[in-house]
């Protein structure tokens, strides 16, 4: 059976306001719905023999002091009231009729991110989370002994990191998980690349796997024996590795260049399924009988045939140096079709988010990553893996700290300089854009140079002090800047574009989600107002009911890309200095108008 939690019940003909879990039975080829009340389910896990299901919910907040407070929200108090509850559902099928019995396992004072069942010791293990990511102590691992109904949860880790993708080893003695650390008060974890760990559930010993791997751990999968497959990123490539849990060394498995995105293994034999793509192959699912068949794998899906029939842009990896510290920076160049390695091309700098992520050799055609479409419109597209990107070692990644805009910004500007020196790019036809941290850097770079004819800012920040105070991830900014705003106000001021908008001349298109809590929409409104007051061409569009990711309405992503392409077409070939002259003339006319109005009222 398969159990799942839909985000939208209407997609499967459910209009009720209550919450449901859905069970698909392979035996009966039928989908069953189970009503679970009003508590919001967040994660679930099967018992050993699939006879029951454990799931965790966010418990509906009790209405305390409603007569006194009415509909008034007490901000932090309301957040602290949110608790979790774990349930167990027992299943019974009789004549294709599903009957269930639901019991409460635990009421918890924590919120739960992920839940897994350990048959070896009859325990549930869960990761704790918090809506406000202010303290890394809120994100740890706990266990619940199902054999003792009164026992309190036992804390397993003190990692001060974000643990996710929890899996239990086949023998039930180890818990594997990936972790992202943003520094540690105990100085245990100071790296910030994604890592893989194994927790011994008998003695609680924590072991880092793939310890000598210099890159980023993107995914992993348990094999049928005591070993794992790992998808590891080095530079712009993601390849397949394996490691025995009793060994330290990784084994590299020779496959195609590109990005292995997801991987799953059979626990009965050597079969492996994986998702793969590159700029030469569209994303599909592949199935092989053994890891030695990686290079001869055949896809079992054909969902992107239309894409393969197109004349796609060709790419190459491009390197340059930041002349300030001689650090080598790498990026991906997307050439327009039929113009591979041509010269004097218009350039669009397309900046990835994160910052702890990277542009990869993969074919992604969504609203967030539309470099292929931009190149097909005639642009040479540069995706720079600036300081802070994963896949280039911990030191490279951590060099973004203390100069979170200015240092990666210089990485990007030196890359543009080198492309111009090499004759690849026309210096008079430059544009820039990015989303999330890519929007942060876009906003910064248009204050540092007048060379860009057009800019595309998505979910970007212009004032990092107010962003720290209003976003749901203040710990990220505290880590990037090195301290809290009132302790180093000069750094927050110097790295915030809002205080340098007088230097901008680039026409800027801005997008934001109306309900974005990761990068609040107010930041985009601040940028729009500042540029409008300076008479710089600017347009802001907001997407209703959308958060940081535009996932609620597919039209929103399409409209975003459509309007950004229009902006590039309108302004991409016009020099920024034309707008400076236009702005100067407008200011002179405005001053003359005020002068004559003053004279008129003075004479009257």
Language-model features, listed with the residues they occupy:
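Beta-propeller and related beta-repeat scaffolds in trafficking/envelope systems
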Residues: 182-201, 206-221, 254, 258-261, ...
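Hydrophobic alpha-helical signal peptides and transmembrane signal-/tail-anchor segments
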Residues: 593-604
């Amino acid at each position: 059976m398969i159990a799942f939690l839909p985000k939208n019940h209407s997609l499967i003909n459910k209009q009720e306001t209550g919450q449901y879990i859905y069970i698909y039975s392979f035996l009966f080829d039928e989908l069953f719905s189970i009503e679970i009340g009003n508590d919001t389910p967040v994660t679930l896990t099967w018992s050993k023999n699939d006879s029951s299901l454990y799931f965790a919910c966010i418990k509906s907040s009790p209405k305390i002091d409603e007569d006194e407070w009415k509909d008034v929200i007490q901000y932090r108090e309301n957040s602290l009231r949110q608790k979790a509850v774990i349930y167990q559902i027992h299943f019974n099928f009789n004549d294709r009729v599903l009957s269930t019995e639901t019991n409460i396992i635990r009421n918890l004072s924590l919120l739960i991110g992920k839940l897994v069942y350990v048959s070896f010791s009859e325990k549930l293990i869960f990761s704790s989370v918090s809506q406000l990511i202010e303290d890394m102590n809120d994100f740890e691992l706990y266990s619940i002994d199902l054999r003792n109904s009164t026992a309190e949860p036992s804390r397993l880790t003190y990692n001060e990191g974000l643990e996710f993708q929890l899996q239990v080893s086949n023998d039930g003695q180890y818990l594997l998980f990936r972790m992202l650390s943003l520094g540690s008060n105990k100085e245990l974890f100071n790296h910030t690349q994604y890592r893989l760990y194994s927790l011994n559930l008998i003695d609680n010993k924590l072991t880092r796997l793939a310890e000598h791997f210099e890159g980023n751990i993107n995914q992993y999968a348990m094999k049928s024996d005591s070993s794992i497959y790992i998808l590891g990123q080095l530079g712009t490539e993601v390849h397949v590795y394996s490691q025995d849990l009793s060994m330290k060394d990784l084994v590299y498995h020779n496959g195609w260049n590109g990005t292995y995105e997801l991987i799953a293994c059979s626990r009965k034999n050597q079969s492996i399924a994986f998702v793969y793509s590159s700029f030469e192959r569209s994303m599909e699912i592949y199935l092989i009988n053994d890891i030695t068949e990686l290079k001869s794998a055949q896809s079992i899906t054909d969902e992107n045939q239309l894409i393969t029939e197109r004349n796609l842009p060709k790419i190459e990896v491009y390197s340059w140096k930041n002349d300030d510290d001689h650090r080598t920076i790498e990026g991906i160049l997307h050439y327009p079709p039929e113009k591979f390695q041509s010269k004097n091309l218009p350039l669009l700098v397309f900046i990835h988010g994160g910052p702890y992520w990277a542009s990869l050799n993969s074919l992604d055609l969504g609203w967030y990553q539309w470099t292929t479409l931009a190149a097909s419109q005639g642009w040479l597209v540069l995706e720079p893996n600036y300081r802070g990107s994963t896949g280039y070692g911990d030191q490279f990644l951590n060099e973004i700290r203390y100069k979170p805009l200015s240092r990666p910004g210089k990485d990007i500007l030196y890359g543009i300089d080198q492309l111009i020196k090499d004759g690849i790019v026309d210096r008079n036809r430059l544009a820039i854009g990015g989303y999330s941290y890519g929007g942060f850097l876009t906003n910064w770079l248009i204050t540092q140079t007048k060379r860009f004819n057009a800019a595309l800012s998505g979910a970007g920040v212009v004032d990092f002090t107010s962003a720290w105070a209003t976003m749901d991830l203040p710990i990220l900014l505290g880590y990037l800047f090195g301290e809290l705003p009132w302790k180093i106000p000069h750094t927050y001021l110097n790295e915030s574009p809002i205080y340098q908008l007088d230097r901008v001349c680039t026409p800027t298109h801005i997008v934001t989600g109306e309900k974005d809590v990761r990068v609040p929409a107010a930041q985009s409104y601040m940028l729009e107002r500042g540029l409008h007051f300076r008479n710089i061409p600017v347009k802001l569009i907001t997407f209703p009911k959308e958060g940081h990711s535009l996932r609620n309405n597919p039209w929103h992503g399409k409209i975003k890309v459509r309007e950004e392409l229009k902006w590039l077409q309108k302004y991409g070939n016009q020099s920024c200095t034309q707008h400076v002259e236009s702005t100067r003339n407008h200011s002179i006319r405005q001053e003359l108008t005020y002068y004559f109005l003053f004279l008129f009222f003075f004479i009257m």
